[in-house]
Amino acid sequence: METLTFEFPAGAPARGRALAGCVGSGDLEVLLEPAAGGALSIQVVTSVNGSGPRWQQLFARVFAASTAPAASIRIHDFGATPGVVRLRLEQALEEAGHD
């Protein structure tokens, strides 16, 4: 098990909380909570050691396209592919953007 942390610049706080995915399914779960301070902080707990560069590249690609909301994101990963990670992350961001 490895715990990784990342920070990215962000805009306005997320509107609400969100949960996407289920780590028990052999996938991953993304938990998102609004945060203040113009920063997006991400903590990843993964079963795959040495995967930090892969996560960094994935997040850089996702957040290069648009301004992320200020939030705290926790990801519990059980070896999900980058495509699934992006899907769950986008689902959580969309859910958190709704009133």
From Swiss-Prot:
Subcellular location, record wording: Cytoplasm
InterPro entries from the UniProt entry: Mal_deCO2ase/Cit_lyase_ACP, Malonate_deCO2ase_dsu
Keywords in alphabetical order: Cytoplasm, Phosphoprotein
Superkingdom field: Bacteria
GO CC list: cytoplasm
This protein's record includes keyword Transcription: no
Keyword Nucleotide-binding: no
One Pfam family this sequence matches: ACP
Residues recorded as bearing O-(phosphoribosyl dephospho-coenzyme A)serine in the entry: S25
PTM per Swiss-Prot/TrEMBL: Covalently binds the prosthetic group of malonate decarboxylase.
Bridged cysteine pairs (disulfide): none
Molecular function GO labels: acyl carrier activity
Functional note: Subunit of malonate decarboxylase, it is an acyl carrier protein to which acetyl and malonyl thioester residues are bound via a 2'-(5''-phosphoribosyl)-3'-dephospho-CoA prosthetic group and turn over during the catalytic mechanism.
HAMAP family: Malonate_deCO2ase_dsu (MF_00710)
Similarity comment: Belongs to the MdcC family.
Official protein name in the record: Malonate decarboxylase acyl carrier protein
Phylogenetic lineage: Bacteria, Pseudomonadati, Pseudomonadota, Gammaproteobacteria, Pseudomonadales
Name of the gene this protein is made from: mdcC
